[in-house]
Design a protein with these regions (language model features):
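Hydrophobic scaffolds flanking metal-cofactor catalytic centers in soluble metalloenzymes
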Residues: 2-177, 193, 197
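Alpha-helical protein-protein interaction elements
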Residues: 154-157, 185-186, 202
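Single conserved hydrophobic/aromatic residue that forms the stacking wall/gate
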Residues: 199-209
Length: 209
């Protein structure tokens, strides 16, 4: 999900690579679940996120829609996101003790936090969001250890390709922003990459079409 911001205003002014140390370790988020509340529709899910959730919960995409995933407009197209529920607008997958019930399969955005990504011509780098996390006594940790994803090189390739693919779809809609075109593009993305899970591993041949 794109954000139109000045990165200098929300970060420590540094950009990080996967092997850099960054003060992001929240020590298991002991006694805190602030970042799991009030996120609106901002926790947008990638096809790989959905694939992991389906495996973790033994559920289809349709079943996930009844458990805590919803559809909303994101950067011009309709994409799935984690739903917030109740008066406290808590993540649907947060239990009564304020702990994540899908931690092993948590979405990419959740794995990153309090880091963010800034996309460049070739790939991306990370930045530390200094005002987002309520934990003030965070420890230093290597970026790739914090994100904790298997086969990080392939995962990063997927993230870059998925970002480029969505950007291409947005450009298509800039030239034809009619409701019919927006619906056609959105349904194509949802059916191909989420419902049918044509793409479930970081080797996005279909994204290059």
């Amino acid at each position: 999900m794109k954000r139109n911001i000045d990165i200098k205003e929300i970060s420590d002014g540094k950009l990080y690579g996967p092997n850099d140390m960054v003060k992001a370790d929240c020590r298991g988020c002991e006694g805190c679940s602030a970042c799991c509340h009030g996120m609106g529709t901002s926790i947008v899910l990638t096809p790989l996120d959905i694939y992991r959730l389906e495996k973790e919960l033994n559920a289809s995409f349709g079943e996930l829609m009844t458990k805590g995933v919803e559809l909303n407009l994101a950067d011009g197209v309709i994409l799935p996101n984690l739903a917030m529920r109740g008066e406290k607008e808590a993540c649907a997958f947060l239990n009564d003790s304020g702990r994540c019930t899908i931690h092993g399969a948590r979405p990419d955005i959740c794995r990153l936090f309090p880091l963010g990504r800034i996309y460049e011509e070739k790939g991306f780098r990370y930045f530390l969001q200094v005002y987002e996390c309520e934990k003030k006594d965070r420890l230093k940790v290597k970026v790739k250890k914090w994100i904790d994803i298997p086969d990080p090189a392939r995962h990063d390739k997927f993230i870059s390709d998925w970002h480029a693919y969505l950007k291409k779809q947005e450009e298509i809609l800039e030239n034809d922003s009619s409701d019919e075109s927006r619906k056609a593009v959105s349904m194509g993305i949802l059916n191909t990459f989420y419902v049918c899970l044509l793409y479930t591993s970081p080797s996005p041949r279909d994204m290059r079409r």
